[in-house]
Amino acid sequence: MEGTWEKEGGGVIIDQAIHSIDLANWFIDDEPISVQAHLSNRGHSIMEVDDTGEGFIRYKKGATLSFWAMNNYACDEAIEIRLCCEKGKAYMSYDDARIEFNDGTVLSTKQGAGNIVYENGKDYWGFQHIREIADFYDAIENDREPFISGKEALKIQQLICEIYENGRIDFE
């Protein structure tokens, strides 16, 4: 059987959603104080782990994060992140970003083609894995700290573990 708790440790949350939750957590830059989640397997009879998950995270300074993830969607789509903030909203998907300020100002950008390298992967997977791996190797070769430290990586891993602890009701 593929997709087991023993071998993979989880499904959509640990494999796919972790990246978006990590990015949103980085934007929020605060300590999570409560996590509510619900995980289930709705569409994959050949795996036992989660293929659907949603949750709500509350942070110390008052920010909140809502997330929804699934890997039983009918087609492959880019990830979307939407931020609603005091002074406006931000939207990111694939290689596009847009900020709409409350005063009507709009900033938008599209990742330049020279910055996007997929290395034979599917384009909706994104391209940051390659950059992070290259930075890690460069940090080892040049005896410096990587852009993303182990300490930062541990923070998101602990948050993902808390999502699993609070959300595995359907798997008990």
Model-inferred region functions:
Residues 1-46:
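Predominantly a Rossmann-like dinucleotide-binding segment in NAD(P)-dependent oxidoreductases
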Residues 18-22, 127-134, 151-158:
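A structural signal for well-ordered alpha-helical segments within the folded catalytic domains
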Residues 19-23, 31, 51, 79, ...:
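Internal, well-ordered alpha-helical segments in soluble enzyme and binding-protein domains
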Residues 27-31, 86-90, 163-170:
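Phosphate/oxyanion-binding loops and surfaces in catalytic or ligand/nucleic-acid-binding neighborhoods
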Residues 45-50, 60-131:
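NAD(P)-dinucleotide binding in Rossmann-like oxidoreductases
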Residues 60, 135-172:
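C-terminal helix-rich "cap/oligomerization" subdomain common to oxidoreductases
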